Amino acid sequence: MRLILLGAPGAGKGTQAGFICQRYGIPQISTGDMLRAAVKAGTPLGLQAKAVMDSGSLVSDDIIIHLVKERIAQPDCAQGFLFDGFPRTIAQADALKAAGVRLDYVLEIDVPFEAIIERMSGRRSHPASGRTYHVRFNPPKIDGKDDLTGEALLQREDDKEETVRKRLQVYSAQTRPLVDYYSHWARVEPAAAPRYRCISGTGRVDEITARALQALAC
């Protein structure tokens, strides 16, 4: 099972990636993990990437694609892999295609933006204990207070509505076009393209997992 998982920030990709990887016995691969591992190992590509990052520049798609090919050639990818957060742009998707990396599925987890904003902006946490709440779905007994200590709950910067909306704007501009890219490729070249599937990411976690596994079985 070789697949790409697509979806907006807050759509639940990380949660579902864990279940999918467990079901198929495949690793979850992100470009960040690949870069860190290559730099730590001191590989030629890792040293190239480190020099670029140290200069404050972005690592080129060419280096990323070479890292991807190195990573998926490792033994733990014998049964497949799940790309999380990659490709991020049409240019990366084109480079992946040109490199001949074979894929079975592209799975999109679709959640309306307003639902994502509500889901993320409603999160609250008690930093000292790690306890988490949600103003609508899992509210504390007293608004804004931790249930056990009565201490104030905090909202992470990443979860503030303005920040969430900005992240969704970036996704719409850079990554959302990949949905059209892969769905179009699947229509015009069904024998060569990965199968494109889209599921709803709303509902209980177990319901979404069931949808994902069903989509990957057909």
UniProtKB/Swiss-Prot annotation:
Catalyzed reaction equations: AMP + ATP = 2 ADP
Entry remark concerning the domains of this protein: Consists of three domains, a large central CORE domain and two small peripheral domains, NMPbind and LID, which undergo movements during catalysis. The LID domain closes over the site of phosphoryl transfer upon ATP binding. Assembling and dissambling the active center during each catalytic cycle provides an effective means to prevent ATP hydrolysis.
Signal peptide: none
Assembly and interaction partners: Monomer.
Name of a matching Pfam family: ADK
Record: residues binding ATP: G10, A11, G12, K13, G14, T15, R123, T132, Y133, G203
Function: Catalyzes the reversible transfer of the terminal phosphate group between ATP and AMP. Plays an important role in cellular energy homeostasis and in adenine nucleotide metabolism.
Cross-referenced NCBIfam families: adk, PRK00279.1-1, PRK00279.1-2, PRK00279.1-3, PRK14527.1
SUPFAM superfamilies noted in UniProt: P-loop containing nucleoside triphosphate hydrolases (SSF52540)
GO molecular function: adenylate kinase activity; ATP binding
EC numbers: 2.7.4.3
Family: Belongs to the adenylate kinase family.
Pathway annotation from the record: Purine metabolism; AMP biosynthesis via salvage pathway; AMP from ADP: step 1/1
GO cellular component: cytoplasm
GO biological process terms, semicolon-separated: AMP salvage
Tree of life domain: Bacteria
Gene name per UniProt: adk
Provenance organism: Verminephrobacter eiseniae (strain EF01-2)
Keyword set, alphabetical order: ATP-binding, Cytoplasm, Kinase, Nucleotide biosynthesis, Nucleotide-binding, Transferase
Name the record gives this protein: Adenylate kinase
Annotated region (LID), positions in chain: 122-159
Annotated residues for binding of AMP: T31, R36, S57, L58, V59, G85, F86, P87, R88, Q92, R156, R167
Location relative to the cell: Cytoplasm
Region feature (NMP): 30-59
Enzyme type, top EC level: transferase
